[in-house]
């Protein structure tokens, strides 16, 4: 929520100096946030996970992507490669990370880079078409609601069953 309050104000203030300055400022803030995230993760991973300054870089790479900083592959083959690599990075994060993986730390780069490459690839790639199928769109529409409700449901079930759940 803090991002959606501060980012428009930052855009309002900085964009009047031109796109190049905007990209540089956003890039500098993203880099500082990433370095801070890695540093804070070593000290207190909960603080790094929950506090906005240490996660702002994740939002800002999306903003920089929207501003075209990372360019776009011109050919369908290039966009397909981007989306396949992105999907593989996200899948690797899901399969390799466990409860012992330091996170966010530098490990957050893997799924964030994957998401960036996947978005950069576009919807007209085979991966984009796969992710646009009905069942996956259904899951996508539900995912944020499930994310918001999963913890209260786990706590309720744990309380109702009176036995800890192995997560």
Give the residues covered by each predicted segment:
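Hydrophobic membrane-embedded alpha-helices
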Residues: 1-167
């Amino acid at each position: 929520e803090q991002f959606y309050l501060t980012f428009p104000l930052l855009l309002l203030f900085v964009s009047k100096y031109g796109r190049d300055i905007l990209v540089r400022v956003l890039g500098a803030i993203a880099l500082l946030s990433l370095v801070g995230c890695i540093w804070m993760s070593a000290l207190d991973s909960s603080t790094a996970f929950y506090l906005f300054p240490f996660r702002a870089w994740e939002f800002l790479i999306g903003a920089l992507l929207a501003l075209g900083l990372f360019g776009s592959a011109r050919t369908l083959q290039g966009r397909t490669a981007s989306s396949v690599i992105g999907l593989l990075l996200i899948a690797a994060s899901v399969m390799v990370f466990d409860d012992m993986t330091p996170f966010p730390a530098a490990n957050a780069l893997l799924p964030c880079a994957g998401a960036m490459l996947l978005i950069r690839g576009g919807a007209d790639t085979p991966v984009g078409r796969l992710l646009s199928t009905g069942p996956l769109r259904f899951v996508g529409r539900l995912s944020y609601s499930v994310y918001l409700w999963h913890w209260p449901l786990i706590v309720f079930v744990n309380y109702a069953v009176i036995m800890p759940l192995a997560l």
